[in-house]
């Protein structure tokens, strides 16, 4: 999965997919009442990027729905996965469950069209704080109560705080999550970060008894760091330059080992070599 980083304006969806992304990451900011409000990152952000592009969250969802609904004039068949980077740092810990409920209602109405031929992309809810694990239950309970438990087949989870792998496993246990887990690791492109924890996550994924199904690394903008990430065995790389990742994947060393994921590739299944 080539994951376009910080795609917060509707116009950027086409821009990143046309550069080779089959997945996008979108920031979600919340108001004081734990309502998802804007797709907005703010300052500071990655070097070389504008941090200030935004939409109202519900408007972005409608644009995303158009891009991921077959038959729509805006449909992009390659776009199969969306990571919502949930900026829950602005919330109190006791608002996490409420944020999950409200997120579920927004997605149900504006993205899934109340279960009636909505967008088809797989969704990863990425949470920065392990203490906010109740967001998951708020989300899953609400979709079930609203009569659409089948949509949970399309939803996975990520804790993005670079916490110790054991602590992340514990948070999932508390949240009652037993699958659909992506594990992120990374840092802004302005700084360097080694691959130690990525390798640990990959080992957990491949052990057959870990909690992780997929591992992605962010933010990867250079050919050398792309090669390092692929060599470490990641399933996805998040990038500001999807075309750079595409170029590396076409190199002799990688083109027979890796290919771009399609809609037929289940993002919740651990890939067996």
UniProtKB/Swiss-Prot annotation:
<feature type="active site">
    <location>
        <position position="5"/>
    </location>
</feature>
<keyword id="KW-0964">Secreted</keyword>
<keyword id="KW-1061">Dermonecrotic toxin</keyword>
<feature type="disulfide bond">
    <location>
        <begin position="47"/>
        <end position="190"/>
    </location>
</feature>
<keyword id="KW-0479">Metal-binding</keyword>
<dbReference type="Pfam" id="PF13653">
    <property type="entry name" value="GDPD_2"/>
</dbReference>
<keyword id="KW-0354">Hemolysis</keyword>
<feature type="binding site">
    <location>
        <position position="27"/>
    </location>
    <ligand>
        <name>Mg(2+)</name>
    </ligand>
</feature>
<keyword id="KW-0443">Lipid metabolism</keyword>
<dbReference type="GO" id="GO:0090729">
    <property type="term" value="F:toxin activity"/>
</dbReference>
<keyword id="KW-0800">Toxin</keyword>
<dbReference type="GO" id="GO:0016042">
    <property type="term" value="P:lipid catabolic process"/>
</dbReference>
<comment type="similarity">
    <text>Belongs to the arthropod phospholipase D family. Class II subfamily.</text>
</comment>
<keyword id="KW-0442">Lipid degradation</keyword>
<protein>
    <recommendedName>
        <fullName>Dermonecrotic toxin LspaSicTox-alphaIA2iii</fullName>
        <ecNumber>4.6.1.-</ecNumber>
    </recommendedName>
</protein>
<feature type="disulfide bond">
    <location>
        <begin position="45"/>
        <end position="51"/>
    </location>
</feature>
<dbReference type="GO" id="GO:0031640">
    <property type="term" value="P:killing of cells of another organism"/>
</dbReference>
<dbReference type="GO" id="GO:0005576">
    <property type="term" value="C:extracellular region"/>
</dbReference>
<feature type="binding site">
    <location>
        <position position="25"/>
    </location>
    <ligand>
        <name>Mg(2+)</name>
    </ligand>
</feature>
<keyword id="KW-0460">Magnesium</keyword>
<dbReference type="GO" id="GO:0016829">
    <property type="term" value="F:lyase activity"/>
</dbReference>
<keyword id="KW-1015">Disulfide bond</keyword>
<feature type="binding site">
    <location>
        <position position="85"/>
    </location>
    <ligand>
        <name>Mg(2+)</name>
    </ligand>
</feature>
<comment type="function">
    <text>Dermonecrotic toxins cleave the phosphodiester linkage between the phosphate and headgroup of certain phospholipids (sphingolipid and lysolipid substrates), forming an alcohol (often choline) and a cyclic phosphate. This toxin acts on sphingomyelin (SM). It may also act on ceramide phosphoethanolamine (CPE), lysophosphatidylcholine (LPC) and lysophosphatidylethanolamine (LPE), but not on lysophosphatidylserine (LPS), and lysophosphatidylglycerol (LPG). It acts by transphosphatidylation, releasing exclusively cyclic phosphate products as second products.</text>
</comment>
<dbReference type="InterPro" id="IPR017946">
    <property type="entry name" value="PLC-like_Pdiesterase_TIM-brl"/>
</dbReference>
<feature type="active site" description="Nucleophile">
    <location>
        <position position="41"/>
    </location>
</feature>
<keyword id="KW-0204">Cytolysis</keyword>
<dbReference type="GO" id="GO:0046872">
    <property type="term" value="F:metal ion binding"/>
</dbReference>
<keyword id="KW-0456">Lyase</keyword>
<dbReference type="GO" id="GO:0008081">
    <property type="term" value="F:phosphoric diester hydrolase activity"/>
</dbReference>
């Amino acid at each position: 999965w080539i994951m376009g980083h910080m795609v917060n304006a509707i116009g950027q969806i086409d821009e990143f997919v046309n550069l080779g992304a089959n997945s996008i990451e979108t920031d979600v900011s919340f108001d004081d009442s734990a309502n998802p409000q804007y797709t907005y990152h703010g300052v500071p952000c990655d070097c070389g990027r504008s941090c200030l592009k935004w939409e109202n969250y519900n408007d972005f969802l409608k644009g995303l729905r158009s891009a991921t609904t077959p038959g729509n004039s805006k449909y992009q068949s390659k776009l199969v996965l969306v990571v919502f980077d949930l900026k829950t740092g602005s919330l109190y810990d006791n608002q996490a469950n409420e944020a999950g409920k409200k997120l579920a209602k927004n997605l149900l109405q504006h993205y899934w069209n109340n279960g009636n031929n909505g967008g088809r992309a797989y969704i990863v809810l990425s949470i920065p704080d392990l203490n906010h694990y109740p967001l998951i239950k708020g989300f899953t309970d609400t979709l079930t109560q609203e009569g659409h438990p089948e949509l949970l087949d399309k939803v996975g989870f990520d804790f993005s705080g670079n916490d110790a792998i054991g602590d992340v496993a514990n948070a999932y246990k508390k949240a009652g999550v037993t699958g659909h887990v992506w594990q992120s690791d990374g840092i802004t492109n302005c700084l360097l970060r080694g691959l130690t924890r990525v390798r640990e996550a990959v080992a957990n994924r491949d052990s057959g008894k870990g909690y992780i199904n997929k591992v992605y690394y962010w933010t990867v903008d250079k050919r050398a760091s792309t090669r390092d990430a692929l060599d470490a065995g990641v399933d996805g790389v998040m990038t500001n330059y999807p075309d750079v990742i595409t170029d590396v994947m076409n190199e002799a060393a990688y083109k027979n080992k890796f290919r771009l994921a399609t809609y037929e590739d289940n993002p919740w299944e651990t890939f067996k070599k």
